[in-house]
């Protein structure tokens, strides 16, 4: 019940999806899947392979789910993430780039970290999928 209340609260803070482009709405949905720790939905919402660039290191994962370790994230104190800024930088028929500023929070709603990430989206059969994440600075997915 606590997690359901948290998800509903977070949903109320996000921008109205009718105000967002399709790639921006896909980013919002991706964060909802992340907060729900729904690896299957995260994999379905991302391209393969998934490229993660952070702290000067570029890693290629077969799927987004392979890059994640929710247990390690929770051990670091992570309880949920919230988007603060969701800005479309570029979009054509096949690709888009979205600049996201977000924070990770602990269970007391204290900020653990705030990050800026540019996500590259690809349009596959009408669905926008996150293909790559370019982090300004350091950020971990738990691995």
Question: Which residue stretches match the model-derived regions?
Answer:
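Hydrophobic pocket/interface hotspot
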Residues: 30, 41-42, 50, 98, ...
